[in-house]
A protein has these predicted regions:
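ABC family nucleotide-binding domain
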Residues: 1-220
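C-terminal boundary and immediately downstream tail of ABC-type ATPase nucleotide-binding domains
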Residues: 221-242
């Protein structure tokens, strides 16, 4: 489904990704963790070409991400992205936030897009807020809208870039509950997060990044057991202290 082979990236002379290689199978949930500045967010942004990379290859369901002939809007519609800062249009209603890309990118008719949006808002528990604006909602509600917006494009995979890091603690669980349900339904997911409880419960595999490298990549049971790299062990011990 998602294949990264020796992906490397530089900002000028500074190398931010070094020979990153991994494969995410269809229906697999992979958590990407690591210290700040380790390249986690950059890595997943490369998957749908929100970041470029200079060496290596990335393919998504057989489509080469770095190929100059690749239709990037089509690729991004097939690989949903949820950011920590929600990225909703503040001047549009919640319903319109979910319909605009369906109409502009997928060519859906207005009523068809609206029906899809209402179905997804019901799915994330926000039907009553369809006519409100983003700033009228809590952070947790806005993030659930962002997830619904990504799902409206019928993606084959979802990328999450620290989706709970900007939320108050009491709002984290409502977002994780939606993500957990997606995983149960078989959505292919790559999720950058420090929510280790979510990783234990939902992820089939954990990738640990450090200094732009994939330093550890193993099944969740092994990562949280006694089989992991010393660098991952040091990181995990700090995370689990709090």
């Amino acid at each position: 489904m998602i294949v990264l082979d020796k992906v490397s990236k530089w900002y000028g002379d500074f190398q931010v990704l070094t020979d990153c290689t991994t494969t995410v199978q269809k229906g697999e949930v992979v958590v990407v963790c690591g210290p700040s500045g380790s390249g986690k967010s950059t890595l997943i942004k490369c998957v749908n070409a929100l970041e470029t990379f200079q060496q290596g290859t990335i393919t998504v369901d057989g489509t080469s991400v770095g190929d100059k002939d690749t239709d990037l809007p089509k690729l991004r519609s097939r690989v949903g992205m949820v950011f920590q800062s929600f990225e909703l249009f503040p001047h549009l209603s919640i319903l319109d936030n979910l319909t605009i890309a369906q109409e502009k990118v997928l060519g859906r008719k207005q009523n068809e897009a609206a029906d899809k949006a209402k179905e997804l808002l019901a799915r994330v528990g926000l039907s009553a807020h369809a006519n409100k604006y983003p700033l009228q909602l809590s952070g947790g509600q806005q993030q659930r809208v962002a997830i619904a917006r990504a799902l409206a494009m019928d993606p084959i995979a979802m990328l999450f870039d620290e989706p709970t890091s900007a939320l108050d603690p009491e709002m984290v669980s409502e977002v994780l509950d939606v993500m957990t349900e997606l995983a149960r339904e078989g959505m292919t997911m790559m999720c950058v997060t420090h929510e280790m409880g979510f990783a234990r419960k939902v992820a089939g595999r954990v990738i640990f990044m450090d200094h732009g490298e994939i330093a550890d990549d193993r099944p969740t049971s092994e990562f949280f057991g006694n089989v992991r790299s010393p660098r991952a062990d040091a990181f995990l011990s700090k995370i689990l202290q709090h």
